[in-house]
């Protein structure tokens, strides 16, 4: 049974999570990709409506359309590869008080250290399931920095229900990505 989390999330709740646990998120997710991470790392200011503290950033460039009433509709919301954000993510976790980062593929040592220090987790979303994940997005509450970065790189504020993820990097210093890589390297060395 997945652990149910509702944003905003306390540090103590995040520190109770362990690698391998399935989680479903209800509440608010903010998207952020390469342009946003670089912008923030270089001292750019968030719009006042964007509340990262005790929240979650999602490495996602959603596909969105406007319906007949002029409301945004998310048709695809799959994760993008998180490794590109490694130069920035640790700083952003600490600077903005993030409690979670959603993406795919995991992240490196700097991000893992920031998760330990600040009380944050990396949550792996299912790659290739963009339409299924979009069904968890109940509405778009806002879009920010669209003029600066364009639709895929803008910050989208999603209201989500039961958004499914797995903890693959926790606040205790464990990284499932590193553990699998190390085990694979050991096994490969046995056969080479």
Task: Say what each PLM segment does.
Residues 4, 24, 57, 166-168:
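Structured core elements
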């Amino acid at each position: 049974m997945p652990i149910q989390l509702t944003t905003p999330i306390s540090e103590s709740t995040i520190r109770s999570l362990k690698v391998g646990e399935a989680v479903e998120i209800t509440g608010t997710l903010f998207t952020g990709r390469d342009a946003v991470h670089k912008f923030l790392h270089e001292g750019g200011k968030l719009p006042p409506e964007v509340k990262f503290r005790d929240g979650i950033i999602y490495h996602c460039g959603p596909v969105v359309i406007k319906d007949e009433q002029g409301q945004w509709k998310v048709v695809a919301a799959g994760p993008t590869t998180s490794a590109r954000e490694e130069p920035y993510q640790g700083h952003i976790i600490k600077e903005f008080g993030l409690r979670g980062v959603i993406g795919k593929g995991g992240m490196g040592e700097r991000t893992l250290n920031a998760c330990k220090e600040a009380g944050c987790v990396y949550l792996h979303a299912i790659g290739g399931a963009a339409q299924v994940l979009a069904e968890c997005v109940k509405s778009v509450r806002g879009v920010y920095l669209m003029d600066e970065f364009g639709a895929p790189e803008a910050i989208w504020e999603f209201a989500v229900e039961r958004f499914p993820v797995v903890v693959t990097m926790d606040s205790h210093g464990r990284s499932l990505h590193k553990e699998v890589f190390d085990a694979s390297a050991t096994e490969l060395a046995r056969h080479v």
